[in-house]
């Protein structure tokens, strides 16, 4: 692979993808980019923790810095240069910080572009509670589910045109002339594609995850009562995957009651579905009934951010974007430019995102140690300002919090 302005490390080895599995050396080269705003605070803090955890299990990450966002524009004249995309393609796993996308204009979302170009079709977000973190619900310890959000389609596909544009007016006229559908001419237009292919590969990944991690259920969340041929089709195709490809592992909710009297058989996963708006109150009132959740893109975005509130907010929520043999790991929160460079913000989301990355490459012991060390740090009262304002304790900066996590990690 040729690079224009960056050079891969000479030491370290590539992660390979063979026969549907990652082959991970003890010293993998992993690209990273800090991104915008607070990325320059939280990514170095996370790397400090990740290095300590890797060392603890006798391994080493060889980091390869690449660029996206404002830094990339200054260096390349391009917010998302080919060097960065090529590095992710070549080395297969990357850690990223948040990227800024202006609302209403400028350039299209860099996050969406990365997902589409690399075909990172599943946004995977584990949602679990860390002891000691303030939560708005009475029993946050019941929260433990993983959200699989389809990443490439739906209204986030970026197929849209502004009000009054030639494309929008042409489409409005076409719909009226061909199908008798009337849309006001002063409308912006967006398209909502949901395909059988994209739906099935997402649900397939979610069910495989449930099987491999001994999860009890997979819930298909949709708005199919209104959008029957997009969201409703998502539901139907999801059930098809469960029945046709995982029939020996899966039963439906109806079968659970009709055949088994409501008692879940050992080794079986219950596949069920919920209407999207209902699901928002379900995760509050019936939290522990949900395990793995699969959704289309838009509702997945909404639900995953709402779910983060249950366990303390976006500042501690990790995330990832996964394709076939390729993964980019990013925190859920944004770039928060007003706090950039102040050594103030909470790096927990980025640290736990790194733990999720380690889990993905098979370093599960290191991943668990990181999560335990973060929990120990917060439970001891060492916290950043966002948590301190709710629970008191010792308020520390970004770097100091990371160092406290490292200290606790080394004691394990």
Swiss-Prot record:
<dbReference type="GO" id="GO:0006099">
    <property type="term" value="P:tricarboxylic acid cycle"/>
</dbReference>
<feature type="binding site">
    <location>
        <position position="100"/>
    </location>
    <ligand>
        <name>NADP(+)</name>
    </ligand>
</feature>
<keyword id="KW-0560">Oxidoreductase</keyword>
<dbReference type="GO" id="GO:0006097">
    <property type="term" value="P:glyoxylate cycle"/>
</dbReference>
<feature type="binding site">
    <location>
        <position position="389"/>
    </location>
    <ligand>
        <name>NADP(+)</name>
    </ligand>
</feature>
<feature type="binding site">
    <location>
        <position position="385"/>
    </location>
    <ligand>
        <name>NADP(+)</name>
    </ligand>
</feature>
<feature type="binding site">
    <location>
        <begin position="333"/>
        <end position="339"/>
    </location>
    <ligand>
        <name>NADP(+)</name>
    </ligand>
</feature>
<comment type="similarity">
    <text>Belongs to the isocitrate and isopropylmalate dehydrogenases family.</text>
</comment>
<feature type="binding site">
    <location>
        <position position="125"/>
    </location>
    <ligand>
        <name>D-threo-isocitrate</name>
    </ligand>
</feature>
<keyword id="KW-0329">Glyoxylate bypass</keyword>
<feature type="binding site">
    <location>
        <position position="149"/>
    </location>
    <ligand>
        <name>D-threo-isocitrate</name>
    </ligand>
</feature>
<comment type="subunit">
    <text>Homodimer.</text>
</comment>
<dbReference type="GO" id="GO:0004450">
    <property type="term" value="F:isocitrate dehydrogenase (NADP+) activity"/>
</dbReference>
<keyword id="KW-0460">Magnesium</keyword>
<keyword id="KW-0816">Tricarboxylic acid cycle</keyword>
<feature type="binding site">
    <location>
        <position position="111"/>
    </location>
    <ligand>
        <name>D-threo-isocitrate</name>
    </ligand>
</feature>
<feature type="binding site">
    <location>
        <position position="115"/>
    </location>
    <ligand>
        <name>D-threo-isocitrate</name>
    </ligand>
</feature>
<dbReference type="InterPro" id="IPR004439">
    <property type="entry name" value="Isocitrate_DH_NADP_dimer_prok"/>
</dbReference>
<protein>
    <recommendedName>
        <fullName>Isocitrate dehydrogenase [NADP]</fullName>
        <ecNumber>1.1.1.42</ecNumber>
    </recommendedName>
</protein>
<keyword id="KW-0464">Manganese</keyword>
<dbReference type="GO" id="GO:0000287">
    <property type="term" value="F:magnesium ion binding"/>
</dbReference>
<dbReference type="InterPro" id="IPR019818">
    <property type="entry name" value="IsoCit/isopropylmalate_DH_CS"/>
</dbReference>
<dbReference type="InterPro" id="IPR024084">
    <property type="entry name" value="IsoPropMal-DH-like_dom"/>
</dbReference>
<keyword id="KW-0521">NADP</keyword>
<feature type="binding site">
    <location>
        <position position="109"/>
    </location>
    <ligand>
        <name>D-threo-isocitrate</name>
    </ligand>
</feature>
<feature type="binding site">
    <location>
        <position position="346"/>
    </location>
    <ligand>
        <name>NADP(+)</name>
    </ligand>
</feature>
<dbReference type="GO" id="GO:0051287">
    <property type="term" value="F:NAD binding"/>
</dbReference>
<feature type="site" description="Critical for catalysis">
    <location>
        <position position="223"/>
    </location>
</feature>
<feature type="site" description="Critical for catalysis">
    <location>
        <position position="156"/>
    </location>
</feature>
<feature type="binding site">
    <location>
        <position position="301"/>
    </location>
    <ligand>
        <name>Mg(2+)</name>
    </ligand>
</feature>
<comment type="function">
    <text>Catalyzes the oxidative decarboxylation of isocitrate to 2-oxoglutarate and carbon dioxide with the concomitant reduction of NADP(+). NAD(+) can replace NADP(+) with low efficiency.</text>
</comment>
<dbReference type="Pfam" id="PF00180">
    <property type="entry name" value="Iso_dh"/>
</dbReference>
<keyword id="KW-0479">Metal-binding</keyword>
């Amino acid at each position: 692979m040729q690079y224009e302005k960056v050079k891969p490390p000479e030491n370290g080895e590539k992660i390979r993808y063979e026969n549907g599995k990652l082959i991970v050396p003890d010293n993998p080269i992993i690209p990273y980019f800090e991104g915008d705003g607070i990325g320059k605070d939280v990514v170095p803090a996370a790397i400090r923790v990740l290095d300590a955890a890797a060392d603890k299990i006798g391994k080493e990450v060889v980091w390869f810095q690449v660029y996206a966002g404002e830094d990339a524009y200054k260096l390349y004249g391009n917010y998302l240069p080919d060097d960065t995309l090529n590095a992710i393609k070549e080395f297969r796993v990357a850690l990223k910080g948040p990227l800024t996308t202006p609302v209403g204009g400028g350039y299209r979302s860099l996050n969406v572009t990365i997902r589409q170009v690399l075909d990172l079709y599943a946004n995977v977000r584990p949602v679990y509670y860390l002891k000691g973190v303030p939560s708005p619900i009475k029993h946050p310890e019941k929260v433990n589910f993983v959200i699989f959000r389809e990443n490439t389609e739906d209204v986030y596909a970026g197929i849209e045109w502004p009000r009054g544009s030639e494309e929008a007016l042409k489409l409005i006229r076409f719909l009226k002339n061909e199908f008798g559908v009337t849309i006001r001419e002063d409308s912006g237009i967006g398209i909502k594609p949901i395909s059988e292919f994209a739906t099935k590969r997402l649900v397939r990944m979610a069910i495989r995850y449930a099987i491999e991690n001994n999860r009890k259920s997979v819930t298909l969340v949709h708005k199919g009562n209104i959008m029957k041929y997009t969201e409703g089709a998502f539901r139907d195709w999801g059930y098809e995957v469960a029945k046709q490809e995982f029939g020996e592992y899966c039963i439906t909710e109806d079968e659970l009651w009709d055949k088994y009297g409501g008692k879940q058989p050992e080794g079986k996963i219950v596949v069920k579905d919920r209407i999207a708006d209902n699901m928002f109150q379900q995760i509050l009132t019936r939290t522990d009934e949900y395990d793995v959740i699969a959704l289309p893109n838009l509702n997945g975005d909404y639900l995953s951010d709402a779910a983060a509130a249950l366990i303390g907010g976006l500042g501690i929520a990790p995330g990832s974007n996964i394709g076939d043999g390729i993964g980019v790991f990013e925190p859920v929160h944004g770039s928060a430019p007003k706090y950039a460079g102040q050594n103030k913000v909470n790096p927990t989301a980025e640290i736990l995102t790194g733990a999720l990355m380690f889990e993905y490459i098979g370093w599960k012991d290191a991943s668990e140690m990181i999560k335990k060390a973060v929990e120990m740090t917060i439970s001891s009262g060492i916290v950043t300002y966002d948590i301190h304002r709710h629970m008191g304790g010792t308020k520390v900066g970004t770097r100091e919090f990371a160092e406290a996590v490292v200290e606790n990690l080394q004691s394990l």
